[in-house]
A protein has these predicted regions:
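Short beta-strand-centered segments that line the small-molecule binding cleft or hinge
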Residues: 1-21, 25, 33, 91-94, ...
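Hydrophobic hinge/microswitch elements
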Residues: 3, 53, 65-113
Length: 158
């Protein structure tokens, strides 16, 4: 499963669903009571992001460059190697971040993070990717069928 566009002729890309990105802040943050936030507002705060090469980071930076202009950019104060590390830094009030809504279900339930919808919304496709092959393994076909079925029966989950 990948969250970025794939342009390799030797691969088959099957869309699964859209993933919506949201801003996250700790509960006491000045933006915590807002329903929506735009990137111009996010740029006012320290920004915590994933490491270079991360699909999430690329989507965010591409969006900021097109919407707000790269010359201003985000005030990146930390680059971390996992979604869990990003969420932990935001919970510790070290800055704001933008993550997949699906990745913060536990934190929202526990009340350790607040999700704020982005304006305009920012979404990315989640797709299954596999090699084009004349001869495919049965196990791979069964896994793909299971994943397709799961996506259809759980539209809210990723």
């Amino acid at each position: 499963v990948v969250e970025a566009p794939v342009s390799n002729k030797n691969l088959v890309v099957e869309p699964c669903r859209s993933d919506f990105l949201v801003a996250i802040v700790p509960p006491g943050h000045p933006k915590a009571n807002q329903e929506t936030v735009n990137f111009a507002e996010i740029m006012e705060y320290p920004f915590i992001c994933r490491e270079e090469g991360s699909g999430t980071r690329e989507v965010i930076l591409d969006h900021v460059c097109h919407a707000e202009g790269c010359e201003d950019g985000l005030n990146v104060t930390m680059e971390l190697g996992s979604p869990e590390a990003v969420k932990g830094a935001v919970e510790a009030n070290m800055g704001i971040s933008v993550v997949s809504r699906a990745s913060i279900a536990k934190e929202l339930k526990l009340g350790t993070l607040v999700a704020i919808d982005l304006d305009p919304p920012l979404e990315r496709p989640f797709s299954f990717v596999h090699q084009k092959q004349k001869f495919r393994h049965r196990a791979m076909d069964e896994l793909l069928e299971f994943a397709r079925s799961y996506c259809k029966s759980h539209p809210e989950a990723v």
